[in-house]
Amino acid sequence: TKNILPDRDIDCVVYGCTSGTIAAGYNSIEQKIKVAKPMADVTTPSTAAIKALKKLNINKVCLFTPYSKKLNDEVLEYFKSEDFEITSNAYFDIEADYDIGKVDQNYLYDVLSKIDLNGAEALFVSCTALPILPIIDKLEKKLNTTVLSSNQVLIWDTLVKINKNNSVEGFGKLFQSN
């Protein structure tokens, strides 16, 4: 963090890895960032997801990840530890972050369009490398439910932290809730 604009104040530092935040823990990440940028707010995909779900009064979540079973289960346990009910869970079982970023959006849309939402108030799609952001609106219309993703909640929380939380079209219901 000390090398990020070393002579400048930064309003918000974004740590952009969902599973990495869960593994390291928010407090550990925040401490390291605050050493270099003590005045900056800090956000991560996992903490932003919790804030977004709470803002939207969502308790029952369908969780999708692209991760291996082991990593998927860690994300699942994290959401449970934050008192969310996971109504269903599915994952791709992809090991490498590079491969996650290569998932075709049409394929992702097809898979998520068929996900079991029975009892869920929202679908959360984990991983900042997964290219879901451009299809969130389309998915929300198809599924008739709120769809949240790591990048989406991270952008939303960053905008809130820097007081730029106007409504933004095209990125799901979350951005209409400001």
Model regions: which residues?
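Non-catalytic structural scaffold of enzyme domains
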Residues: 1-178
